[in-house]
Amino acid sequence: MNTSVPPAVSPNITVLAPGKGPWQVAFIGITTGLLSLATVTGNLLVLISFKVNTELKTVNNYFLLSLACADLIIGTFSMNLYTTYLLMGHWALGTLACDLWLALDYVASNASVMNLLLISFDRYFSVTRPLSYRAKRTPRRAALMIGLAWLVSFVLWAPAILFWQYLVGERTVLAGQCYIQFLSQPIITFGTAMAAFYLPVTVMCTLYWRIYRETENRARELAALQGSETPGKGGGSSSSSERSQPGAEGSPESPPGRCCRCCRAPRLLQAYSWKEEEEEDEGSMESLTSSEGEEPGSEVVIKMPMVDSEAQAPTKQPPKSSPNTVKRPTKKGRDRGGKGQKPRGKEQLAKRKTFSLVKEKKAARTLSAILLAFILTWTPYNIMVLVSTFCKDCVPETLWELGYWLCYVNSTVNPMCYALCNKAFRDTFRLLLLCRWDKRRWRKIPKRPGSVHRTPSRQC
C-alpha cells in the first residue's frame, strides 16, 4: 500500500545502473514477480470472499474491501511498472505512461491511508459512542465515506501530476526518468511525507490507544459485574420460575429424572444460542446493537419433544401449558409473573457485555495488525526522506530501492492480516484456495425469530 511519496519517483532515487549481472536481474525479476503475484492473489481473495460470503458483508468490512482495491491496484500496476523501470535502467514507455502510472499510484496510495483513517475513526466512535454512532452506521453511509476518500485522493493528486507541466509551461523531468515534476525539491518531498505519513500515523496511533483504554475499562466493568453475580449463582432459584414446563410448579409427584432433563434443556438451548451468535459474528467487526432494542416482556417459546421415562408417575399439567413447550425470556424480557428474574437479568446482561467485549477485542486486533504492518513497512522509507532533506547524498541507492519495495510489501501483507485476525476471512480463503466453495452447500439456520444465519454444511 503506497501511502506517501513513493521512492520510485523521488529525485533522490536513481534506477539500477547498467551492467547489472544476469543473475542479479533474474533474482530481482523473480522476486518482484512473486511479490506482485502474491499481492494480486491475496487481494483478489478478499474481493471474492466479500462477494460469496454474506457473513463478511458488514459495515467495517466495506473499509477493508476498499483497502483491498487500492492494494490490488498497487500489485497489478505499480509493482510491475517499477520493476520494468529498474530492470531496464530507464523509463522507456513515454511521458504519458509515466504520468498516468504516477497518478494511479498516488491516488491509490492516498486512498489507502484515508481508508486506514476511516477504519480507525469507525472503531473509535463505535467504542466511545456506541448508541449515537451506531444508529448512523449503515452500509450506505460507509459507501459514501469510501467514495469521498477516493474522490479527495483523486482531486489532490491526479490533476497536479498530469497537468503541472502545462501550468508552469514546460516539462522539467529528465529524459528516460519518471518522477513527479513538482516534487523535484527535497523540502517539498519532506513536507509531503509529513502530511501523508507522519500526521496520519500519529492520529491512528492516538485513536488506537484510546480504543485500547476504553476496551480495558469495559473489561474491568464486566469483571465487576460478574463478581457481583457470584453470590447468587448457587441457589438456582430462577430455574423453575423462569420456565413453564410439566411438573415444574406445585407437583411434588413429578419424576426427578424427567424434571431434571427438562430443566437442563433451556440452558443447553441458551448456551447454543450464544455460541451460534458468536460464530456468526466471528467475521464481523461490528458491535452488538440489535439486542439492545428488544422489547421487554416478550418471550421466546421453544418447542421440543419430551423425553419418555419408563417409571413415570402421572403428573398434573399446569394450566395453559402444553407438554412439549419450554418458555424462556428474551435477553431483556422477563416471563410474566415469574420470580427470581433479577439474577437472570444480570446474567443475560453480563453475557451480552461479554459478547460485545469479545467482538470489540477482535476488531481492535485486526486494526492493530493492519496498523502495525503499515508502520513497519513505511517507516524506513520515510526516515530516509527525513535524512535526505538535510543530507542529499547520505542515503545509498540500494537502501532507497529496498525501502521502496518494503512499502509495496505492505500491500502483500494486508490480506494476511485479515486472515490472521478474522476467522471468517480465514475459512473463506481456505475454501476458495481448495476449490471447495459451493453456495449450494450453505444452509440457512435460524438464529432468532426474524433473522437468518448462514453456516457451511458439514460437507465443507
Curated annotation (Swiss-Prot):
- Which residue ranges are assigned to the Extracellular compartment in the record's topology? 1-22, 85-95, 165-185, 391-397
Q: List the disulfide bonds.
A: C98-C178
- State if rRNA-binding is listed as a keyword: no
Q: Which key words tag this protein in UniProt?
A: Cell membrane, Disulfide bond, G-protein coupled receptor, Glycoprotein, Membrane, Phosphoprotein, Postsynaptic cell membrane, Receptor, Synapse, Transducer, Transmembrane, Transmembrane helix
Compositional bias ranges of the Basic residues kind: 328-343
Q: Where is the composition biased (Low complexity)?
A: 238-257
How would you summarize the oligomeric state and partners of this protein? Answer: Interacts with GPRASP2. Interacts with TMEM147.
**Function of the molecule:** The muscarinic acetylcholine receptor mediates various cellular responses, including inhibition of adenylate cyclase, breakdown of phosphoinositides and modulation of potassium channels through the action of G proteins. Primary transducing effect is Pi turnover.
Tell me the protein's name. Answer: Muscarinic acetylcholine receptor M1
